[in-house]
Amino acid sequence: MAEEAGRALWERLEAHHKAGYLSLHMPGHKENAALAPYLARLGAELDITELPEFDDLHDPSGVLAQGMDRAAKLWGSRKSYFQVNGSTGGLLAAIRAATRRGDQVLVARHCHKAVYHAIELCGLDPVFLLPPVEETFGLAGSLSPEQVAQALEDHPGVKLVVYPSPTYDGVVSDTAGICAAAHAKGVPVLVDEAHGAHLGFHPAFPPGAMAQGADLAVASLHKMLPSLTQTALLHAGGKLVPLPQVARQTGIFQSSSPSYLLMASMDGCVRLLEEKGEALFAAWHRRLTEFDQGIQGLRHLRVLGHGREAGAHYPGIFALDPASTSQDFPASACQMGRRAGWALPRIRRVSFQVTARKGPSSPWKSKKVSRGRTHPTRGSVP
């Protein structure tokens, strides 16, 4: 134990990598440098500061500006901004850009804590909307356009609508309907799309927030796509929130010394999607189909929208992201897992995402997940 306590963090990380664990968590690249070769190149020799020929994130006009323009084209936004402080920084910037101190904001109760931090920092007055609960899996359901429309009638002073879609569990809300309800009152919509950077890139996936009329959306590249942890995009669409204000707030809520390693991984991710996105997403969808087929016969595991649950109707849920695999274990399955040496929490229901689905993972990983032969974890299942 003393020897373990004395090991440096990088040594522990290296040992974890060499142990060959199957990643059931973020980041979306799954340590797959073969898929995204640029990630393997991002070491200390490429870690620089703002040199003229490498552009400046806070005043972009060169390679960074070009990378963000390419991202805007891919996601269909008026403007997209690289975020080195993750979706957290993007949410803070977006909320600040769309509001003034003392404004009333309509907020889904299951928003990320960054939204609550923004409310505190910006001195906002929140009006909370409670999503329905899907009883079978115990998950927060979808926010509905009717809820939003009624809340805007009841609170005519609201200046912004904020909600997550998809959620961590893959629950998608009717963003087109919500935007229609909000825009009828002249109110902009911010979608926390942290878990949805992949949406809209394949017909099997729901459309993204920008395609449905959202004014602002924040998407974590590192959660679902091959980019380094802490990388995200802030998308701006529509004309209800001025672009200069969005740009200014991204500068306020990001480091003045943004990492070129993080920015290079974002630029590389965008280029990968441009060049190989269609084939990669087709392969991803094919493996999700294989996953569905592989779990059909499982008796002690239910997966939201997959396997025996495919095509099921869940009250309170508008749609599901098929890339998400929230799972329900009965108590008996947890006991079986513990006997096999798995470190499962001592609770009846364990919902988590099998994140080998996050990005086009290799076939052997898909088989390991579908057959239930994952490695034991050292801690609780995420």
What is the predicted function of each stretch?
Residues 1-62:
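N-terminal "arm"/small-domain region of PLP-dependent enzymes with the aminotransferase-like
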Residues 30, 223, 268-270, 322-324, ...:
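Glycine-rich beta-alpha junction loops
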Residues 279-354, 358, 368, 372-382:
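Conserved small-domain helix->loop->beta segment predominantly found in fold-type I
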